[in-house]
Amino acid sequence: MQGCQRSRVENMSSSGNVHVEVAVDSLDVEALRGALDLTGCGSVVTFVGVTRDVADGVEVKRLEFDAWEEQLPGVLADLGEQACAQFGVHSVALAHRTGVVLAGEPIVAIHVASPHRAEGFAACAWLIDELKAQAPLWKREVRVDGAVWKAGLG
């Protein structure tokens, strides 16, 4: 990604029309979108997940993500390639944060470029569901009343 300023991207890989990043310090949603190949596309569908500031009526200070760092980029890339094949989309760019993510900050970003919107929306929804089910990530929610590990792989 030319001209892209990032705060320490830990792992980055591109395979065909799939671009994956694992970001430690920040996630630049718009710069990630620039990794898409828009050839022949009339649609870009985007999902951005952010740390909520309140959960179950209690203030959330931050999330802390732990990852199997050697495996995470490959899992994300495999999901992107599956989405391209299964839904007929042209290009996928996805990124996930690790470490500390404060309330309001992006955790995950998924961009899907496709000829038409229907397959883009379907692929994007499938990607976030599969990422949550398959990615080797664990999440600790730190709230004003304590901390709790949330469901994750493993």
What is each residue range found by the language model?
Residues Q2-C4, R8-I107, A113-G154:
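N-terminal, polar/charged subdomain of small-to-medium soluble alpha/beta proteins
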